[in-house]
């Protein structure tokens, strides 16, 4: 299908600051896509997954022009689950051409990200693959769904083999057991050694951030971050478009 015919369902787009992750506090353009294949207990954007949610359809070129017109270099593709949008690679291919942009894809961990990674184009696979890792302006923030989500059984674990140094893993935790599971994943897949960003976020009302810090101290988890969602301290936690 040609780019002109491919459309994406967008439920909202806005400029604000990144509330979490490696670029927390920096301006970003958020593009939220409709629909999700999971139903997490603590999801704060379930409205975007409802069958009757209102949306606008954009082509690849229209989304690219939206991004350029925003004059913001950090772009977060979120949802819902952006990777279940048909023909997402057509959009990513377009965005990869513009190295002035820093694209972050927030994905729920159930979709195989390998499908969306850049592939070598010649027989010199290793050299090109290494170059693509260093030059790719598209990164993934992989959300590992711990037990508190009710969706842990949906995790596609091979994703953790394919993570690169520019990618991030986020664990939303609600108990010491969730923290222990996060530690197991971090160690099993050598996420620190890979250079991935690693963040632990508390599920509101389930665990105290101080207990998370104590867990890091007790287990000497270097290069692992406890993060609180910055935007929820600045605005009402239920407010949209911020």
Where are these regions (language model features)?
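Short loop/turn positions at the edges of beta-strands in beta-sheet-rich folds
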Residues: 35-37, 71, 220
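N-terminal [4Fe-4S]-dependent radical SAM core
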Residues: 1-32, 37-54, 232, 236-242
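Generic, low-specificity signal for short hydrophobic/alpha-helical stretches with a mild N-terminal bias
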Residues: 13-18, 45, 73, 77, ...
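Short hydrophobic/aromatic-rich motifs at helix boundaries and adjacent loops
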Residues: 34-36, 63-64, 155, 184
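Generic structural signal for well-ordered alpha-helical scaffold segments
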Residues: 18, 64-68, 187
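Conserved AdoMet/S-adenosylmethionine-binding subsite of the radical SAM
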Residues: 84-242
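Conserved Radical SAM active-site core
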Residues: 8-11, 27-28, 39-137
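Amphipathic, alpha-helical segments enriched in basic
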Residues: 6-11, 15-18, 38, 42, ...
